[in-house]
């Protein structure tokens, strides 16, 4: 299993950060790595990359303004994502951790760097959207 973590302080209050991060049907308006999202149910959604590669997410924990967790699955990997949100006045600290298992042995050496790249891009896009 590969674990990747990113922590960042965002210059926006926790209510805005939470609203944007959990509003998955609007991801394509601010995330540069996605073409669209599809809401399956209250607890499940699918993200499509710009190359139309699908990943299914199943929400497992929602503690408003504190914690969001989900399971992830696609043809290359499965795993679990944990996001914590901490208010500090008009700023919010986010702490996102992914635990991923590659389904194909030849992908294992690349998983950590791929996850880190994805996390960095997500946070960059989020900050650009919220801090504009």
Model-based region annotation:
Residues 1-38:
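Hydrophobic ligand-binding cavity/cleft-lining segments
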Residues 1-9, 57-58, 88-91, 120, ...:
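Hydrophobic-ligand-binding modules of eukaryotic lipid transfer/binding families
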Residues 12-15, 76, 117:
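A generic structural signal for alpha-helix starts
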Residues 21, 31, 98, 118-119:
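Hydrophobic alpha-helical core bundles mediating ligand binding, dimerization, or RNAP-core interactions
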Residues 40-46:
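Short coil-to-beta transition motif at edge beta-strands of beta-rich domains
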Residues 49-93, 99-102, 128-129:
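Hydrophobic-ligand binding "helix-grip"
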Residues 99-132:
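A conserved amphipathic terminal alpha-helix motif
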């Amino acid at each position: 299993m590969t674990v990747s973590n990113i922590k960042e302080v965002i210059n926006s209050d926790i209510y805005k950060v939470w609203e944007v991060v959990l509003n998955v049907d609007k991801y394509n308006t601010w995330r540069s790595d996605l073409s669209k999202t599809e809401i399956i149910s209250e607890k499940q959604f699918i993200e499509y990359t710009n190359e139309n590669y699908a990943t299914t997410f199943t929400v497992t924990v929602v503690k408003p303004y504190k914690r969001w967790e989900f399971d992830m699955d696609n043809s290359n990997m499965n795993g679990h994502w944990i996001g914590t949100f901490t208010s500090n006045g008009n700023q919010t600290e986010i702490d996102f951790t992914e635990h991923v298992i590659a389904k194909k042995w030849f992908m294992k050496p690349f998983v950590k760097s791929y996850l880190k790249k994805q996390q960095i891009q997500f946070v960059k896009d989020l900050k650009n959207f919220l801090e504009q």
